A protein has these predicted regions:
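Alpha/beta-hydrolase active-site loop
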Residues: 151-172
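Catalytic histidine-centered segment of alpha/beta-hydrolase-like enzymes
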Residues: 294-307
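Conserved alpha/beta-hydrolase "acid-adjacent" motif
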Residues: 272-278, 299
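Short beta-strand/loop motif that positions the catalytic acidic residue
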Residues: 258-259, 265-267, 271
Length: 317
């Protein structure tokens, strides 16, 4: 019987390692929400199907390493009058596709989707935002939607989006930057939004305002909560995977201390991925509204109180 003890320990270790690696791998390679996802979920398949959208363009940004100027590709559709321009990407290029939607307000806005989602999911949040910006950039993050590569799980996406907003603004005919930049993010996108706002503040060009929908403070929060929702064990596994993927992660509440702009956080009372306590912890000490009856996927999509709070915040800032 004694030889069985080390054998059992080896087997337990192998199972633990395999499970932890599987958690990390899923986090890095989520299922993609593309055009087919939108059709399957009876969601808008393009900005043209969103009520209130009048004009929109489709484009993409070829990402370059720091110190290089990103190239933009503008793809005129039948509804677009802007010319195509840019240098063709190479086989090794990472190209982030985006939509540029003309709104009825002032300033520019960046709308960032969450983990495992895409710009198609962002279209669900567009109706609440159209009257508060002259132009809204709706991108796919790396490793999501139609963007190639693997996701950084929110840890370096702000660097990609820094390039995207520079190029998308050049494609806008609205002069949107005159009214400042509003950054809106959902779930993982909220983490990206906070980091981008901090980056812009450090550069001396702070964002006008920041909206965080279902934010979380660190990667362990959604990673562990998603396992619980699926009835899978969390134990030390989620913590180990999160440490592996985000060893140098700064909590979002610390990042927010550097953003230098008004912040609003929205959460849902039925959210099991980023619970109300998780939202408050991430956004403290900023204005936070938790609306009962709203789950994670529908924060920023449903809820009268949430919509009124968002409208009031965007109107006064």
């Amino acid at each position: 019987m004694i030889p069985l003890i080390p054998l059992a320990a080896v087997a337990a270790g192998a199972i633990t390692t395999t499970y932890t690696v599987a958690i990390a791998r899923e986090a890095k390679r989520p299922r993609r929400a593309t055009y087919a996802w939108a059709l399957a979920h009876h969601s808008a398949a393009s900005p043209a199907e969103v009520p209130g959208v009048r004009t929109w363009h489709e484009g993409s940004t070829v990402l370059h390493t720091m110190g290089h100027t990103p190239a933009a590709h503008h793809t005129p559709a039948a509804h677009s009058t802007s010319p195509a321009h840019a240098t063709p990407p190479s086989a090794r290029s990472i190209v982030l596709p985006w939509w540029l939607v003309e709104g009825q307000g002032a300033g520019a806005m960046l709308l960032i989707h969450g983990w495992g989602r895409s710009r198609w999911d962002s279209l669900r949040r567009l109706p609440w935002l159209l009257e508060h910006a002259a132009s809204i950039v709706v991108p796919d993050l790396r490793g999501h939607g139609e963007a190639p590569g693997t996701t950084s799980i929110g840890h370096s996406d702000h660097l990609d989006l820094d390039q995207v907003i520079q190029r998308a603004d050049n494609a806008s005919a609205s002069g949107a930057t005159n009214g400042g930049l509003t950054i809106v993010g959902h779930s993982m996108g909220a983490m990206v939004a906070a980091r981008l706002a901090a980056l812009l503040a450090a550069r001396g060009t702070p964002a006008r305002r920041l909206v965080l929908m279902a934010p979380y403070d660190s990667l362990i929060v959604p990673m562990a909560n998603r396992l619980r929702v699926r009835g899978l064990p969390t134990g030390p596994f989620a913590a180990s995977a999160a440490w592996w993927l985000a060893r140098d992660e700064e909590p979002v509440h610390r990042t927010l201390a550097r953003v230098q702009c008004p912040v609003l956080a929205l959460g849902g009372g039925l959210d099991a991925v980023t619970t109300p306590d998780d939202v408050r912890r991430a956004a403290a000490p900023h204005e936070t509204l938790i609306e009962p009856g709203i789950d994670h996927a529908n924060v920023g999509v449903e809820g009268t109180a949430s919509r009124e709070a968002l409208h009031a915040f965007l109107s006064r800032t």
